[in-house]
Amino acid sequence: MKCFNPHLEILSEVQQWVYPQLRNLKDLGFVLYGGSALALQLGQRQSVGFEFFLHGRLKQKLLRGACPLLGDESLVTQIQDSENTVTFEISPPDSGKGIATISFFGNLGYGRVGEPRLTEDGVLVVASALDIFATKLKGIIQRPSTEDFADIIRLIKSQESLLEALEAASILFGTDFSPMLALKALSYFDELKPPLSQVDASFLIEQVSNTLKNISVRNIERPSLSVNS
């Protein structure tokens, strides 16, 4: 597995406090996705939460064993609890640090396209930019947000291909994903709050137009989320 030097400076103060306590999660097969995964790789937009995905079923006893912090009721409040989704809100001893959330999603059997990467300090396994891109394209169809649009723009500007991300999402999510609906969603941003800048809006329109000329979907093997599982 390739390593990268994470942009820890982009994390909030409370996330930096939590970060080293997440080291054992990778041994259970957890892979970091979402805005924080992207921020660690690109060093740009700050995200206040960690989102961990797991290929298999979520087992809370093992989860709490790997991350004892989650069992400290003086610091942690569980705000969501379902069979394969749990979310915790963390307030460190120094309340001035703020609050962070950690979410865990299990039984995500759709696999991956890119190769996850390990932070050089050995703390986290992080999803590839392509896989994060694919999940964000699916997300904007259902729940468009300015944050996801901003992340997609950053991904494209960091040389990630919109066309390849559409192909990846089509393979990962099958009939639950429509490339054309994703492109339509990328072209409809008038109701986003806060709104996109005119520069970003024009950039997206140009990218969608260029992609429409070349869109296609290829078959790609779907291994599990983690390299070791």
Q: What is the role of each PLM region?
A:
Residues 1-229:
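Compositionally biased terminal segments of proteins
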